[in-house]
């Protein structure tokens, strides 16, 4: 009885791209199996709907979970269209943000006591994609941002509070600079008043 042995070439992938979601206009959160620490920016291909390749600026692997990989691009992806991400022969699609501001907030509701801490305005779309991070004191035609405290001081973009429990007030507004026929602001968000509180170092949190 003759027996024939068939040899089959099995393609072994170094990485398997499982999913992609957008964090910021120029940042993607990818889930990737494999030795992710070895991924080079040049190995990841991101294409626009018109097949234009967007170069990847950096690849960053989460220190606690190696399947969580952040891909940063030089260009913004904010036209609401479908993009493709390819790595090691696997392609995953995602729809980019439409760049429409749905919410505004500050990045830190609490700051460490007696420590100068930068405060940023954060604007997000309806899906939570960060569209803008604006440090206090940076002028932008679409945003108003005031920061006041009687219990410390503001130095540039940084806030300092004297003791635990002391507060500052941030007031933020998003402006479309568009108006209705009767002259009212159209599509603005705010003004939102938010409180920032000084806490001891161990309990500091940030909005995610």
PLM features: residue spans?
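Short, surface-exposed alpha-helix to beta-strand junction/turn motifs within ectodomains of secreted
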Residues: 27-59, 132-149
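Extracytoplasmic/surface-exposed domains of secreted proteins
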Residues: 1-2, 27-48, 66-92, 168-180, ...
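Short, solvent-exposed loop/turn segments enriched in Ser/Thr/Gly
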Residues: 25-28, 112-120, 166-170
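Short S/T/G/P-enriched beta-strand
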Residues: 3-19, 90-124, 180-208
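Short, acidic/polar linear motifs in exposed loop/turn regions
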Residues: 36, 125-127
């Amino acid at each position: 009885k003759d027996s024939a042995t068939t040899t089959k070439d099995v393609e072994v992938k170094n990485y398997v791209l499982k999913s992609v979601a957008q964090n910021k206009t120029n940042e993607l959160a990818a889930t990737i199996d494999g030795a992710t620490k070895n991924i080079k920016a040049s190995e990841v291909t991101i294409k626009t709907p018109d097949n234009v390749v967007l170069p990847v600026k950096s690849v960053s692997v989460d220190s606690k979970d190696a399947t969580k990989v952040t891909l940063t691009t030089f260009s913004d992806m904010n036209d609401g269209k479908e993009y493709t991400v390819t790595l090691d022969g696997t392609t995953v699609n995602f729809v980019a943000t439409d760049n429409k501001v749905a919410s505004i907030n500050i990045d830190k509701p609490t700051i460490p006591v007696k420590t100068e801490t930068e405060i940023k305005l954060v604007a997000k779309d309806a899906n939570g994609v960060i569209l803008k991070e604006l440090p206090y004191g940076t002028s932008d035609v679409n945003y108003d941002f005031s920061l006041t405290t009687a219990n410390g001081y503001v130095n540039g973009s940084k806030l300092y509070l004297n003791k635990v429990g002391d507060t500052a007030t941030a007031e933020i507004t998003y402006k479309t600079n568009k108006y209705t026929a009767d002259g009212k602001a159209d599509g603005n968000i705010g003004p939102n008043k938010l409180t920032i509180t000084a806490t001891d170092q161990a309990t500091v949190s940030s909005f995610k």
